């Protein structure tokens, strides 16, 4: 809980405003000096200045000094987006002895200079209005307090593939207890189907070593043939019920979702109707059992970059080249054709593409709109493909037709887990992170993280890297004795609450609940301050702190002042 300075409770606002040049990002369009001078005359403003980079350490020190010298009890910074820098400035206020919620940030970069580059005079006037609005709102800001909750230093990892195994081991090595839940009867997931890597990696050996390490680690409890039935609680204190082979109730502080994905099951190219039409995964097993291959045709982007699955599965091209090289090294007389629209051997994998060329693997490019035609020709398979180089059709009769099947989400399992935990899914059924750049392994719900194929298609190395990242983020919570919750959250006026439960239906974070008085109440540990419930409440009984109705009115009326 914050210790508030005496001036936080004073009704008279003493506002300090800092306008940022952001190098030339803002000042090349907006007349920053003119904005700063204009602000000085506004009611409640006792200090105004402009700085080159307000986020620099020198300016942070300057802000702390000005707060103390001029007894500021509100601070407004006009600069870039609060999404990236609000926390920095709030911490500066806290270090200066001012409640961090007595801070307001105005975006005059993304919302002004960047979108009005050809209208500097109008951009300057708009910047004045935006800052004026923030000053009007800041006069009504009130200090907020946080409350502490204890943290259970235990993790639940859902999914026992290589991503889940990696996360569990990482956390266990850091000294945390881990519950590892897997719906299948063995750990390992999709990695069991890879016999070797593009660079010769022994994935079966690697996987066996990791499974043995997990089984021997006393900090990891393994629950096979088990699924999650229910999840309650919030960051630091979750309660999860398991069903299946190890039905029980678990207490833990964080959750890592590593549920994996599946190989696309083709309904095209005679797959399932001809024994010689197989996927790359099946070819890996065939490679161990076969010495002569004859003619092999591989078709890329099967189940990827299509109308149903518009994304690239990232691994298919590399897998095709890996297996093509393996075939040619085992049977140099084999004829291998790879039919492709775009070949994506990203990063160093281009080296293996050149190696395949050297081994006389033939690559045939076909147009996006003209997929190869595959049909039975007696007992054989007939493939007709348009070669864009010669602009004519080529007919091949392979001994093996290998389909580079993509990676698809396990939609039903993901949907059920998403509903249980209020987690977002994208249009393809994959779990979605909170922000692709700022929070790439976090869900919007605090204390819940994701990694591996549950997030999106990626190769094994990327799955391992993301699993380590998720474990690292989880450890930032598990390593604490307590967490502070509250601040910018919604609050409900019980006297006005009609118990209509609209807020319970609207909240995607499961924060509202019905208390023992029959009224709705907000769990501050779950609330993310999105304001959906406040906007939806028909009784107007809900207020979002730091964005109350009176503060909104002050913001808008100040912007519209002449």
Regions found by a protein language model. Give the residues of each.
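Residues forming the flavin
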Residues: 1-5, 9-562
């Amino acid at each position: 809980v914050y210790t508030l300075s005496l001036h936080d409770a004073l009704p008279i606002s003493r506002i300090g405003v800092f306008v940022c040049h952001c190098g030339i990002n803002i000042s090349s369009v907006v007349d920053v000096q003119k904005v700063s001078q204009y602000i000085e005359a506004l009611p409640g403003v006792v200090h105004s200045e402009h700085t080159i980079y307000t986020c620099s350490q020198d300016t942070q020190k300057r802000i702390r000094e000005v707060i103390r010298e001029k007894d500021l009890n509100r601070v407004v910074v006009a600069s870039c987006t609060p999404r990236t820098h609000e926390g920095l400035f709030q911490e500066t206020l806290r270090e200066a002895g001012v409640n961090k919620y007595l801070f307001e940030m105005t975006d005059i970069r993304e919302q002004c200079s960047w979108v009005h580059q050809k209208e500097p005079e109008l951009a300057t006037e708009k910047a004045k209005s935006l800052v004026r609005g923030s000053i009007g709102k800041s006069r009504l800001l009130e200090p907020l307090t946080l409350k502490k909750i204890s943290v259970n230093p235990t993790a639940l990892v859902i999914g026992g593939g290589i991503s889940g195994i990696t996360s569990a081991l990482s956390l266990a090595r850091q000294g945390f207890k881990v519950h590892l839940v897997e719906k299948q009867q063995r750990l390992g997931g999709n990695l069991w189907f890879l016999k070797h890597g593009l660079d010769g990696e022994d994935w079966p050996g690697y996987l066996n070593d990791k499974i043995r390490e997990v089984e021997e680690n006393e900090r990891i409890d393994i629950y096979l043939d088990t699924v999650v039935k229910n999840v309650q609680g919030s960051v630091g204190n979750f309660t999860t019920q398991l069903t299946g082979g190890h039905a029980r109730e678990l207490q833990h502080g964080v959750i890592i979702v590593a549920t994996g994905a599946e190989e696309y099951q083709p309904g095209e190219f005679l797959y399932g109707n001809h024994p010689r039409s197989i996927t790359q995964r099946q070819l890996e097993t065939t490679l161990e059992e076969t010495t002569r291959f004859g003619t092999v045709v591989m078709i890329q982007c099967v189940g990827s970059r299509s109308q149903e699955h518009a994304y690239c599965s990232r691994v298919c091209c590399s897998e095709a080249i890996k297996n093509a090289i393996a075939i040619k090294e085992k049977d140099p007389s084999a004829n291998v054709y790879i039919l492709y629209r775009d070949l994506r051997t990203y990063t160093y994998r281009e080296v293996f593409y050149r190696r395949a060329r050297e081994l006389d693997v033939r690559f045939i490019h076909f147009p996006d709109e003209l997929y190869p035609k595959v049909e039975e020709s007696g007992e054989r398979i007939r493939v007709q493909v348009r070669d864009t180089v010669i602009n004519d059709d080529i007919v091949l009769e392979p001994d093996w037709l290998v389909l580079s099947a993509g990676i698809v989400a396990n939609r039903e399992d993901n949907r059920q887990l998403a509903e249980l935990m209020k987690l977002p899914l994208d249009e393809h059924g994959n779990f979605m992170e909170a922000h692709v750049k700022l929070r790439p392994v976090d869900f919007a719900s605090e204390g819940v993280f994701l990694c591996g194929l549950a997030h999106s298609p990626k190769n094994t190395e990327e799955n391992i890297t993301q699993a380590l990242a998720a474990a690292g983020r989880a450890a930032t919570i598990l390593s604490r004795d307590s967490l502070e919750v509250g601040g910018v959250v919604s609050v409900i006026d019980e006297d006005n609450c009609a118990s209509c439960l609209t807020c319970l239906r609207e909240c995607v974070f499961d924060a509202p609940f019905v208390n023992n008085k029959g009224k709705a109440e907000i769990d501050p540990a779950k609330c993310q301050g999105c304001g959906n419930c406040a906007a939806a409440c028909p009784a107007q009984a809900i207020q979002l702190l730091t964005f109350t109705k009176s503060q909104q009115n002050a913001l808008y009326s100040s912007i519209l002042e002449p």
